[in-house]
Regions:
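Sec-dependent N-terminal signal peptides
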Residues: 3-13
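Beta-propeller-forming repeat regions
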Residues: 16-663
Length: 663
């Protein structure tokens, strides 16, 4: 039986729309000395492959792979060690390598730099050519049958070759079905995650001896280890192993064997208080580095210093992680950032606050001016005496337990209670809206711990992963969100913790304003901002989106339906396919939008969304399918201007006078 064309296309959805910024646009740069800032590739995720002395420095250089974006292996030259002990590296160079992720890089005693890679059911050995900056294949062999579909490998060297540890799945299967359907239910009626809990374990392939399971159980690390490193922690611990994990634990195995493996029971790497450390973000991989280890997953790279001490549990004790640094770095806002511009420290110039998928709120201090801004690398905003970090936890993500470590925090700031200082209101992965009241001063914010906002005594709740728009209108504070019906909805402040219903916002033709291109995982992901873009005195919406957003309706909305194309066929045939293909199967990427207010601030009504185009009439799409924020701002002079982000944490300030918003 012939399959419908759209079903055939589903099987070949392999390409996506390409990002576009105006020619010459550069990411905002770090204004710290030597441009130092957190080391992060232009990727969602990182895999630290290992280190080697390539350039002859005092400390080793670093090999890092990126994915979730352009996939490549990068080499970072060591240049310094910062005061807090974190290594500092130069800008990366791309290494020619046929393999991008499932590998481990190490240096033999004679100086040769070796890369071992998993290529489906084969193990590939490569050697690094320093002159050509290339990993050249030298050997390829079948993996033993017991090593079935390994996800990562770790290497312990010995005089006879390599002792290899492979990460394998226990075969557990998660919830059935698609998160993009009404039928999706990741939790049962008792609130418990459905499906089997997926765990990983280790199998060893020693230089001498049999291939065998080397961990005590097949239920070692939930969901993913994401990487394995051999590490020398001193006498009696020269050949231990540490793995990463989906949830951010670093998992330690003492190896008693002088060759091969004799692993003890797993232990969670401890902090100096004796409690298990938890990486700041999801999915850290790990690699030993002199003095400790480097870990990275989603987000930037971190260095953990080994203290030389051991916890009562038998785990090694490491210091709290500090950022690995790069010179001449872009400002880094974390993955899927959602920014706002306010004078956070009361010095008369606009700073940047940004939330991200890790769940932090970051403060980028402007040490320049509004016309010529210069920003220092971020510090994390605190509330109630602790860093703000909002994450889904066990049941806070509609896509399931495996998303417990994501937050997708989207902050906005306004003087909510008219006491002269800025407060924070946030949306996040849960769809809830929280307020952080500022009890400090204009120059030194001091936020209370988060409290819910209520409407009619019910927690204010809407679509997940959205940002609230805030404005002062006629002496009252207005708040707009994407509500539970998937519509733009206005609320008015009653008091510090309560709002009243202001009604659904509408288009100028009277229709409601829808948001999502689908249900479940295809819903929400909309970052609203009140801003007078056309300077007519009426507040418009500037909107950050993901690719599955469809404003104002699923049939014609932006960007998904209006800009989406089939990812397979171009030209005339492609245009015909586009007309026949359901919108949810078309591909585009997150696109900043503006919706002009054709009414007044007191009686808002909005025109259909418009895209921003550059002087060559090309649509501005900073990069990424998930979602990022976009706000109007007076930063940069001759405003209004547009501050946008790609999902890899870079921010871009675009001059408004070089942007077009005509239909």
């Amino acid at each position: 039986m012939k399959q419908p064309l759209y079903l055939l296309l589903v099987a070949t959805l392999c390409s996506a729309a390409e990002p576009h910024l105006p020619p010459g646009t550069k990411a905002l740069q770090s204004a710290a000395p030597n441009g130092r800032g957190p080391l992060a590739l232009v990727n969602l995720n990182h895999h630290v492959l290992g280190h080697a002395r390539v350039f002859g420095g005092k400390q080793p250089d670093l090999f890092v792979a990126g994915y979730g974006g352009p996939q490549a292996v990068h080499l970072f030259k060591w240049v310094d060690t910062s005061e807090n002990g974190a290594p500092v590296f130069a800008e990366p160079v791309v290494v020619k390598c046929a393999f991008k992720d499932k590998g481990s890089v190490f240096q033999r005693d004679g100086g040769a730099v070796i890369g071992l890679w998993i290529d489906k059911e084969e193990l590939v050995t490569t050697e690094f050519d320093r002159e050509k900056l290339e990993f050249r294949e030298t050997k390829r062999e079948k993996l033993p049958k017991a090593v079935k579909s390994p996800s990562s490998l770790g290497v312990l060297t010995n005089g006879e070759g390599y002792d290899l540890a492979f990460e394998l799945s226990n075969g557990g299967k998660g919830a059935e079905g698609s998160a993009n359907t009404e039928e999706w239910r990741p939790f049962n009626s008792s609130g418990i995650a459905v499906g089997e809990l997926r765990y990983r374990y280790l199998i060893g392939w020693p230089a001498k001896g049999e291939v065998r399971q080397i961990t005590k159980t097949k239920r070692e690390v939930f969901f993913s280890m994401h990487g394995i490193t051999g590490i020398d922690l001193g006498s009696g611990h020269e050949r231990d192993l540490i793995t990463g994990s989906r949830q951010g634990n670093l998992v330690f195995y003492h190896n008693k064997a002088e060759g091969g493996f004799a692993l003890g029971t797993k232990r969670l790497v401890a902090g100096e208080d004796g409690n298990a450390l938890r990486h700041p973000s999801i999915n850290p991989s790990v690699a030993a580095y002199p003095g400790g280890l480097i870990a990275c997953g989603e987000g930037s790279l971190y260095f953990y210093r080994f203290t030389g001490k051991w916890a009562k549990t038998g785990a090694p004790v490491f210091a709290e992680p500090v950022s690995v640094l790069q010179e001449h770095a872009d400002l880094y806002a974390g993955t899927l950032p959602s920014p706002t511009t306010v004078d956070w420290n009361g010095d008369g110039v606009l700073d940047i606050l940004a939330g991200n998928s890790e769940g932090f709120v970051l403060f980028f201090e402007n040490v320049g001016s509004n016309d010529e801004p210069k920003f220092l690398p971020a510090t994390r905003v605190q509330a109630g005496g602790r860093e703000i970090q909002v994450q889904a936890g066990y049941s806070g993500s509609l896509q399931g337990l495996q998303e417990a470590r994501w937050g997708y925090l989207s902050p906005n700031a306004i003087d909510w209670n008219d006491d002269g200082v800025l407060d924070l209101i946030t949306g996040d992965i849960t769809g809830n809206y929280l307020i952080y009241l500022n009890r400090g001063t204009k120059t030194a914010a001091k936020l209370d711990a988060a409290r819910p906002l209520y409407c009619d005594g019910i927690d204010l709740h809407g679509m997940w992963r959205c940002r609230p728009a805030l404005a002062k209108i006629g002496g009252r504070i207005a708040l707009a969100i994407v509500d539970g019906d998937d519509h733009f909805h206005l609320y008015w402040r009653i008091d510090d913790y309560n709002v009243e219903d202001g009604g659904k916002l509408k288009l100028d033709d009277g229709r409601l304003i829808g948001t999502s291109g689908g249900v479940g995982g295809m819903s929400g992901r909309c970052k609203l901002d009140f801003f007078d873009w056309n300077q007519d005195g009426a507040l418009d919406f500037v909107i950050g989106t993901g690719r599955v957003v469809a404003i104002p309706d699923r049939e014609t909305g932006y960007p998904m339906a209006a800009l989406g194309q089939n990812p397979v066929v171009g030209g005339l045939i492609g245009s015909l396919v586009d007309k026949a293909l359901p919108a949810k199967l078309k591909k585009t990427i997150g696109t900043p939008l503006v919706m002009l207010n054709t009414g007044t601030n007191e009686a808002m009504k909005f025109a259909r969304p418009l895209v921003f185009r550059d002087e060559q009439n090309v649509v501005i799409q900073p990069g990424g399918a998930h979602e990022t924020g976009a706000v109007g701002t007076l930063l940069g002079g001759n405003g209004p201007n547009l501050l946008i982000c790609n999902e890899a944490g870079r921010m871009f300030l675009l001059p408004g006078n070089k942007l077009q918003t005509t239909p």
